[in-house]
Amino acid sequence: EENTNALMTSCADALHFSMMSGDVKITNSLIEYSHDDALNIKHGYFYKVADADTSSYTFTFTRITTSMPLPNEGDKIAIYEESTFNSHGTYTVVSAKEENGKMLVKVKERIRNFNTWEASRVTFLSNTPNFVFSNNIVRNKRNRGILVQVPNAVIENNTFMNVGHGSIQAATAMDKFN
């Protein structure tokens, strides 16, 4: 703004995180004047369910996010219907391998009613960050405030002022919002 010390960055997001795991906490911060998002954190769009063999407890997935690793034994995955976000369950991985561009993932739990499922997506729960965004001020933004694309995020006690295109967009890897 003219005659002030306020400057807008020429880059897009002030904070942009991708493919993180562990604890990611942003607290007691002032974020302002970024060109696009004050914060964008993403991780979880993992695979699309291509098929399932319910007798062998094996899913066939195709990749959506190319850089996501295969799950290991004991990892947790969750499956959600694309159009409704309804859960098709959380599964524990027994084994996973890649064959001909597809992922074959054997799970511990029984796959129920697969023949009734609509198009569904998989979230790799064991490889997503524990995200906390609290006690922050996001202001003077011409675009979106924060874009959160990870499951189980905690967003609390923040102030959004002069944000042009919405304060919070939550697209959290198909989980539901409380």
Where are these regions (language model features)?
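Small/polar beta-strand repeat architecture
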Residues: 87-132, 139, 147
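Short, contiguous acidic/charged loop-to-helix segments that flank catalytic cores in large enzymes
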Residues: 121-122, 143-144, 173-178
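Short glycine/acidic-rich loop motifs that flank beta-strands on beta-rich extracellular proteins
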Residues: 2-13, 22, 35-41, 142-149, ...
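Short "repeat-start/strand-capping" segments in structured domains, especially the N-termini
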Residues: 20-25, 129-132, 150-155
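Ser/Thr/Gly-rich low-complexity blocks that favor extended beta-strand/coil architectures
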Residues: 66-102
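Short alpha-helix capping/helix-loop boundary micro-motifs
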Residues: 58-66
